[in-house]
Each structure stands twice: as C-alpha cells, then as structure tokens.
Swiss-Prot record:
Residue ranges of the TM segments: 173-193, 221-241, 248-268, 286-306, 312-332, 341-361, 400-420, 438-458, 461-481
Motif (PAL): 463-465
Lineage: Eukaryota, Metazoa, Chordata, Craniata, Vertebrata
A GO biological process held by the record: membrane protein ectodomain proteolysis
InterPro entries for this protein: PA_dom_sf, PA_domain, Peptidase_A22B_SPP, Preselin/SPP
Primary role: Intramembrane-cleaving aspartic protease (I-CLiP) that cleaves type II membrane signal peptides in the hydrophobic plane of the membrane. Functions in FASLG, ITM2B and TNF processing. Catalyzes the intramembrane cleavage of the anchored fragment of shed TNF-alpha (TNF), which promotes the release of the intracellular domain (ICD) for signaling to the nucleus. Also responsible for the intramembrane cleavage of Fas antigen ligand FASLG, which promotes the release of the intracellular FasL domain (FasL ICD).
Disease: Immunodeficiency 86: An autosomal recessive disorder characterized by susceptibility to mycobacterial disease after exposure to BCG vaccine. Affected individuals usually develop localized mycobacterial lymphadenopathy.
UniProt KW keywords: Endosome, Glycoprotein, Hydrolase, Lysosome, Membrane, Protease, Signal, Transmembrane, Transmembrane helix
Domain named PA: residues: 63-151
Record bears the keyword Chloroplast: no
Protein name per the record: Signal peptide peptidase-like 2A
Record-level Gene Ontology MF annotations: aspartic endopeptidase activity, intramembrane cleaving; protein homodimerization activity
Organism: Homo sapiens (Human)
EC numbers on record: 3.4.23.-
Post-translational modification: Glycosylated.
C-alpha cells in the first residue's frame, strides 16, 4: 500500500473554494420624506421579480405604513384601517416573506418592505410557488428603518428607484490583474521549488524531498476522490449551511493565516539582515519569523471579527485569499498532464452541474451554488471563498448602500493555477525555457477576458471555469503537440529528467562512483 495521505487545513478549504455565483439581488434607493425633510436609504430587491424606475423623477410616491408589530402571516393581521395603496413595513420571520407579500397584496398594498435585524441579504426564494405575487418586495435594515422613524416621524412617504449601472466597470480590470498575477506568481514559485528539488546535491536529499511531496501530489485516483468530496461538501453545505458556514470560516482563518506566513516567510528568508535567533526546546527560531507568525494570525483574527464590515474588511479577505491561492498553487502538485485534464475536466462538469442542472432537482428551483452564495435560510454569513473588489464606478446616490462588489471564486484561480504550475515545472524539467508556462498563463488571461465579455453581454454571473478550462487545456496541448513532446507532457515525472542538472551538480561537487575517491 502507498503512503496514507492526510488532508491539510488548506486542502480542506480548497474543497469549497470554487465559484459561487452572484444572486439576482440588486441595490436600490428608498427616498423617504417626512417632517419637511428627505433622506435616502439603501434597499435590496430582485429585478427579475419586479422592475423599478431608474430615476427619482419617474418613481411613484407611496405612503409608508409600519406593521413591524405584527407578523402579517394571516389576513387577520391586517389592521382595521387597511393597507390599500400603502408600502407596508413587515418584520422578517414567522412565515416566508413571499407569504407575507401575498397577504399584503390581497390587502391592496403596493409594496412590501421586509425589515431585517442584521446586515442586508438578497431576497431569494421559489417565486414559482407564489406566481400571483406582483407587488414590489424589498429588504431594508432595521437600523435604517429605526433612523427613518426617528428622523422623519410617523407620516412618511417613499419613492423607490434603481439607478442604472454602466455595462463596463473597471473593477473587472482589478479582478483580472489579481487573478492573472496570482496564477502567474504561483506557477513561477512552483517552478522555483522544482528547480531546488532537481538541484539537490545528494540522493538522500532527493529522496527526502520526494517523500515529503508525495503527500502533496494529486494522482489521477486522488483527483477523482477529491472531486467526489467536493460534491459531497457542496451538498452538505446546502442542507446544513447555518452550522457549517462557521466551520468553513474557521478553516479559512487557519489556512489563510498559514498561507500568508508561508508567502511572507519566503520573502523574509531572502533578506540577509535581522537573522538573530532564540533557542526553544533544542531548536533555534528566528525572532523575525516569530513576529511574522503573530502578524499573520492577527490579520486572520481581525478579519474574522470584522468580516461583515463591507467598507474595509474586503481588503483583508483579498490579502488572505491571494496568499491562500498562491500557497496552494505552489504546494499542491499535479504530477502529469493527465491528472490536469482529469481535475480540470471534472471540476468543469462539477461547476456546470451545480450551476445549471441543480435548479431542475432542488425543490425551490434554485441553483445550489446561487443558494450558497446568497446564504440559504436567510443566513447573513457568507462563505469566504471569493476575491471581492468594490465597484469603482457607482453613482453618489448609491453611497448609502452597502458597497457593491464584484467577485471571483478562489477556484477560478487555484484550479487553472495548478495546471500553470505543472507547465512551469515541466519547463524546468525539460529545460524548455518558459514556453509552456508563458503560453498557459496567456491562455488563462484570454479565458478571463472571455469570461468578462460574456458577463457584460449576458448581464449575469458566469461560471468562469467554463471558459478558463478549455482555453488553458487546449493551449497547453497545442504547445506540447507542436514541440513533439505530448507523450512526455502527458505522462510527466518530477524526477525523470535530471541528467543535465546532475552533470552540472557533479562538476561543482564531483563524486566518483564505485571504488574511486570523492575529490576534496
């Protein structure tokens, strides 16, 4: 039997680090008037359910009625004065908000605002179960509603509208740079590690490195098992989200802190200053690395505590996420192109299945990935599996809303990044300069551009692997075919092509086999 493989915290986090699409929620403005003054508030609504005008001038003025003291789950909850032509404010809970909307509509209400006690989350649910619901449904925070009552009094009228967004947002450029930079640097770093392995002076060093890396190498069988576990984890998250989301947050904190340490420690080791050490249990530890570990833990803890602070917590999440992706691309190894094809192919099917097929299976007709992205059961916690960048272009009036963001799943970086890392290692093994590495990196960039183009045209979140996998696999295959190295590239072997490096090493450290003497 082969060595038993253990799954590290980083590997466990990778199981759920694949694309989660945006839901159909959209920010809108609630323009409230009362006591001779006006104020704007943020609300979330589903544009596929109800359309809103794009300007304040075209919005209709509606009188607001506070029904937060009643659950509005039965017709008897409607007050005697009625709610006809009103925008009613109801509390979250007791029954489904779509049931509340149906009752409000029967009472003649024109709109329903659901007050949530925590941060806003997108309205989601199976609209097909309530096809008769036509009124506007929107969500506002309890904090905003309380401020509205204190500032504007009891006699409030509201206008609701949703300013149109430009088709292109420069946030796409930022995400593009982050993604390409991460896969390129991770692949290059993996190549440097491979070069160090091949230049190991002694056979013992090589064997020690080889055994160490066996735990981090994905064989074809391991790849299949990995994808199966991914599917199981996705289903478990779907049914037990409200508990498992905190497990995933904890895993991300541990894995990202370790990854950030590994990335920064690699840089610090290149600095020839401040190398003082202290002895602890017979081992010498550099003081600067001790401080570094404390810093990395502190960054992860601060993010965990303030993860819902949308104004700035995204910066920490992106830093931790980039480090997490870099470390996995450098550490995890696909031994050959065959494993790359199996992994990327299966994860492409995984992505398509959970985005496009699961709506035909789930009871509410929603994609499992979309449900997890929104937070099932109205859960305000989100899985930290994405790079988040606030939109750089948005109207000043939208500043009252939670900062709108564009996202890219970790899986859209890590999965193609593992292929690019293999290409770089193959370059090192064969001495083929950077041809495979550069070609696959350029192909990844083209795939990202294609993803953004489709995103703009379709105006809907896209499973990026649908475009990244074909671009990278086809490009790598064409390069290997043109260089007549397909067989070698397909089978791969981290230790099969070391003759030229052995010769170079032996010239510096000549060792004569047999009965001859090692030169001193």
């Amino acid at each position: 039997m082969g060595p038993q493989r253990r799954l590290s915290p980083a590997g466990a986090a990778l199981l759920w680090g694949f694309l989660l699409q945006l839901t159909a929620a959209q920010e809108a403005i609630l323009h409230a008037s009362g006591n001779g003054t006006t104020k704007d508030y943020c609300m979330l609504y589903n544009p596929y359910w109800t359309a809103l005008p794009s300007t304040l001038e075209n919005a209709t003025s509606i009188s607001l009625m506070n029904l937060t003291s009643t659950p509005l789950c039965n017709l008897s909850d409607i007050p005697p004065v009625g709610i006809k032509s009103k925008a009613v404010v109801v509390p979250w809970g007791s029954c489904h908000f779509l049931e509340k909307a149906r009752i409000a509509q029967k009472g003649g209400a024109e709109a329903m605002l659901v007050v949530n006690n925590s941060v806003l989350f997108p309205p989601s649910g199976n609209r097909s179960e309530f096809p008769d619901v036509k009124i506007l449904i929107a969500f506002i925070s309890y904090k905003d509603f309380r401020d509205m009552n204190q500032t504007l009094g009891d006699n409030i009228t509201v206008k609701m509208y949703s300013p149109s967004w430009p088709n292109f947002d420069y946030t796409m450029v930022v995400i593009f740079v982050i993604a390409v930079f991460t896969v390129a640097l991770g692949g290059y770093w993996s190549g440097l590690v491979e070069l160090e392995n091949l230049k190991a002076v002694t056979t013992e060093d090589r064997e020690m490195r080889k055994k160490k890396e066996e735990y981090l190498t994905f064989s074809p069988l391991t790849v299949v098992i990995f994808v199966v576990i991914c599917c199981v984890m996705m289903v478990l998250l779907y049914f037990f989200y409200k508990w498992l989301v905190y497990v995933m947050i904890a895993i991300f904190c541990i894995a990202s802190a370790m990854s950030l340490y590994n990335c920064l420690a690699a840089l610090i080791h290149k600095i020839p200053y401040g190398q003082c050490t202290i002895a602890c249990r017979g081992k010498n530890m550099e003081v600067r690395l001790i401080f570094l570990s404390g810093l990395c833990i502190a960054v992860a803890v601060v993010w965990a505590v303030f993860r819902n602070e949308d104004r700035w917590a995204w910066i920490l999440q992106d830093i931790l996420g980039i480090a997490f992706c870099l470390n996995l691309i450098k550490t995890l190894k696909l031994p050959n192109f065959k494993s790359c094809v199996i992994l990327l192919g299966l994860l492409l099917l995984y992505d398509v299945f959970f985005v496009f097929i699961t709506p035909f299976i789930t009871k509410n007709g929603e994609s499992i990935m979309v449900e997890l992205a929104a937070g099932p059961f109205g859960n305000n916690e989100k899985l930290p599996v994405v790079i988040r960048v606030p939109k750089l272009i948005y109207f000043s009036v939208m500043s009252v809303c939670l900062m709108p963001v564009s996202i890219l799943g970790f899986g859209d970086i890590i999965v193609p990044g593992l292929l690019i890392a293999y290409c770089r290692r193959f370059d090192v093994q064969t001495g083929s300069s950077y041809i495979y590495y550069v070609s696959s990196t350029v192909a990844y960039a083209i795939g990202m551009i294609l993803t953004f183009v489709v995103l703009v045209l379709m105006k809907k979140g896209q499973p990026a692997l649908l475009y990244l996998v074909p671009c990278t696999l086809i490009t790598a295959s064409v390069v290997a075919w043109r260089r007549k190295e397909m067989k070698k590239f397909w089978k791969g072997n981290s230790y099969q092509m070391m003759d030229h490096l052995d010769c170079a090493t032996n010239e510096e450290n000549p060792v004569i086999s047999g009965e001859q003497i090692v030169q001193q």
